[in-house]
Amino acid sequence: MEDFLRGMQQSTLTTSVLFATPTSIPIIAAAQEALRDTLQQPTSLQRAAAAVATSTSSDNVQLKSSNDSTINGVVIGLLSSFGSAILIAFIFLIVYFFKYTSSGRILLDRIGRPGEYDDEQAFAKEEAEALEEMDDLQRTEYLRAKAFVQSNPPDSLPTDISLSQYLAIQEKGVSAWEFEPELEIANCFVEARTEIEFFDSECCTLTNLPVPKQNEVYYWESKIYDKPENTLISIGVATKPYPLFRLPGWHKYSVAYTSTGHRRYNQPFSGPVYGPQYVQGDVIGVGYRPRTGTIFFTRNGKKLEDVAHGLKSQNLFPAVGANGPCTVHVNFGQSGFVFIEANVKKWGLAPMTGSLAPPPPYGSEQGSILLEAGREGAQSSNGHYQPDPRHGRTRSGNFRHGPPTSPGPIRSPTDISLAQLTHFPSHEEPGEASNSSTPAPTGGVTQQSGLGVHDNAQPPPEYTSPLPSAAGSPRGSTDSERTPMLRRKTTPPPIPSYNDAVAQRNRSHSHRDRSGGRRERSDSHRARQGDGNPSQS
């Protein structure tokens, strides 16, 4: 029994150790303590689970910490970049404020362009300083130009292209543009529309038409043909009305590139350096972009920087001025440009040729006025010009007008004389016959023989239709313009025999002998009558 109880205790202890389940069987205190110690110690499975849980939690903590560090790095980088940009912009604004708003100036347009400050105080200060340095003549000219601009503001006159000017551009092309010199100043001379010659005083000239605004870019060039060293040339654009006794670029609204290398934009006092100086032989180009109102210049085919912006509402005219003797030739597009881009893209003011047809050739076509003015048949009875219908041609080439219906002087082909012809004005209406009764001329006018004037007793010979042309002649060809519409078939004449030829020869000799005898008898009869007349007297 004790052995059985002892075995049960061992099995219960083993079961409790393996399954960690408390037993209800009473055991001894030592066994209970041993069991308690065993239960308190973790098993290998529990150790593995605890290790896995610990590693997972540590990985989660590390991943979370790495994500937080990445986000923090990105945020710090963005904040540093924006902070640097804001700092640079702030520094730039400070420099800009102290540089461009000094002396009470107010900037109304872009940076770094002269003449764009509309501050009255600053302009008055510059004007006072400039007037002190001017001599009497320069001061007078400046005050005169100032008064002109005040009384004639820019664009105060209608300068838009009218319908008639538009039609002229369509007909003439680029030849519609030409420079108009001021006749009152008479200091420049324009030849062949675009060749300008200046003399000894200051003046400028503008074109008759403004620069169009339909295309993307318009461009024109000026070549310096003759320029002394002390002559100042100013090339650019200006609005109308403009004081023509001043150079372009000196007053509103005008932009110019001077021969000293400076640019003038509404600046009568001074201008900054813009580009290299140009001398005799150089080619200066002016470009205009209507959509943005941008003006740029070129020198010998090389583009320079833009000068002005925002000139979109004004009508700009090409302008050339000088203060001394020089010669400038302007190319609006009638020939090739030196600036390659403008030459390829056709930046001229208009096409080279318009739709206007050339004048008709003068000749015998459709009764040319130059040829018909000296002929007697050129005017009808009422004094109006009537073209000769015999000179007309049609596209068919075979149509021919009939003979003229109005009567004219009738001459025989054999009556040739160098004497002066006597002209009798015709009072017949067109369509009447040429042999109608005509009152005899009075006033002692005598008719001379051999002049082709016939009386009623001897009417002119009847006109017959011309013989048909031979098959091989130009009139006989069906493709020729001289081919008559009515053609008759002709048969070749028969070839006479030898007997017929001898008989015809004998008949001609006998006819000649009879006519000679008649002539001798008539001469003898006239001689007898002449001898008898003196005896009767």
Swiss-Prot record:
Q: Where in the cell is the protein located?
A: Vacuole membrane; Endosome membrane
Topology within the bilayer: Single-pass type II membrane protein
Q: Which residues lie on this side of the membrane: Cytoplasmic?
A: 1-73
Q: Where in the sequence is the signal peptide annotated? A: none
Question: Any keyword Transport?
Answer: yes
**Protein name in UniProt:** Protein ssh4
Q: What does this protein do?
A: Components of the endosome-vacuole trafficking pathway that regulates nutrient transport. May be involved in processes which determine whether plasma membrane proteins are degraded or routed to the plasma membrane.
Q: Which GO terms describe its biological process?
A: protein transport
Task: Please give the residues the UniProt entry marks as glycosylated.
Answer: N435, N506
Q: Where is this region: Disordered?
A: 375-414, 426-537
> Where is composition skewed (Basic and acidic residues) in this entry?
513-529
Q: Which family does it belong to?
A: Belongs to the SSH4 family.
Spans through the membrane:
74-94
Q: What is its main location?
A: membrane
> What does UniProt list as this organism's lineage?
Eukaryota, Fungi, Dikarya, Ascomycota, Pezizomycotina
Residues forming the B30.2/SPRY domain are: 141-337
Gene3D superfamilies this protein is in? 2.60.120.920
Q: Which residues lie on this side of the membrane: Lumenal?
A: 95-537
Key word Acyltransferase present:
no
Q: Where is the composition biased (Polar residues)?
A: 433-450
Organism equals Botryotinia fuckeliana (strain B05.10)
InterPro entries reported for this sequence: B30.2/SPRY (IPR001870), B30.2/SPRY_sf (IPR043136), ConA-like_dom_sf (IPR013320), SPRY_dom (IPR003877), SPRY_Ssh4-like (IPR035780), Ubq-SigPath_Reg (IPR050618)
At the top level of its lineage, which domain of life is listed?
Answer: Eukaryota
Looking up Pfam families in the UniProt record yields: SPRY
One GO term describing the cellular component? endosome membrane
Alphabetic keyword roster: Endosome, Glycoprotein, Membrane, Protein transport, Signal-anchor, Transmembrane, Transmembrane helix, Transport, Vacuole
